[in-house]
Amino acid sequence: MTGLPDGVDRALRVLAAVALERRQAYDALDAATGDGDFGSTFARGAAAVVRARPDDLRTAGLAFAAAAGGSSGALLGAALVRLDGRGLSDGSDAGAVAAALLDADAAVAELGGAALGDKTLRDALHPAAEALADGDVPAAITAARSAAEASAGLTARRGRSAYAGERSVGAVDPGAVAVADVLEAWVAGEPPTWEALLDRVGEAAADDAEDDRVDRAVDGLVAAHPTLRRLPGVRAVVRADSGAGPGGEPRVVLVSGGGAGHEPLHAGFVGAGMLDAACPGAVFTSPSSAQVLAAAEAVDQGAGVLFVVKGYTGDVLNFGLAAQSLTPASATVLVADDVATAVDDGPGRRGTGATVAVEKLAGALAAEGADLESCRAFGQAVADDARSYGIAFRGEEMEQGVGIHGEPGRPLEPRRHGSALAHALCEPLLAEVDPGAPLLVLLSGLGGTALLDLRRRTPTWPRCSPGRAARSSAAWSATW
């Protein structure tokens, strides 16, 4: 038992049991249009709650968010924190439970910005809470399940599934399904004990080596580079030296991060003239706000912290929460450069390749001793002027506009070669930038293209647009 009221203790055990049991099923649902990690994120947060066995919901929420990462970790953690102190007891008062669920729904809406109909867990949580307010538990469960099934007919407008646009229609939202599953389990019978749940956490950890793989990779990076160190107890890589300003004075420091699986981004760019700290999340999952906060506090020199954040919901949420909790002055550069996701009713463009340019150029300015606002303004100008576009190859077919986590792009088409491929890459980009501006061209294989192939394609840029090529300041090709 915990120090929580019996009903709340039971509800937490129900939540944890569902998350641990259905991890793979939720991942599979999420993979249909997203990056396939909702179940893993949900289970990771639940496992942290089981290990903590908290005496209040605030502690439960903070533990969940710190371990889970991603947008789901931040949102569900915030919902648990919001419920703390509501006076919930044995869970038999349907009206009190309904009010609590509506409050949790409001917390998710405020932090994540999702409206009803955006194809998120709110689409099941809100109608279930409203039905429960009338004291009708079966109606609440039916409302949640019906809403979860109906989410298949919605177009996603929040989270990574939103980048699939109309192709998200036909797939249910895993968060909405999870809400229905939890409510059904809530009335189905007694959930496992904390001891039994802890055994399940251990079994899951033995079966799933993902977190261990990321931690070992971080340790390997640090072991290979004595200029780096890992923060004790935190998955964060920082510079081993202080890296003070030109005259030894404090300077602005840069902190970034993102899901593992995109190496060398971001930890590979920790060093002089670039990042001072990087926070790797789980594979394809943004780091938690706790990671980001610890990294920022570790490297702060007193001149301010500049966060470089990619335009993904989880990154924006977790870096934003860290900035709110950070005592030193901070500022944020938001990178949103992917033209394939520039739609009016979506979550905004994804942040991709331009992140490397921002980290390098803003990092160089910080190393010269520029103040926080100058570094922010310059970094944001670089980000605002940048555009990127991705193409993936599948045998003799290719997919334009694909995301870095495998988010679907345009329908498959015959593979192009030579100048035809260069035009496919360049046309969406040239339409978005100032015709007379000098250009910095970055060609990245994202770890999936041999450097030999990247380098041989770099000269195709002049054939793509001769007039533009004359104004190219530089062309870089590598794996970023």
Predicted regions and their residues:
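N-terminal loops that bind phosphate or other acidic moieties
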Residues: 1-480
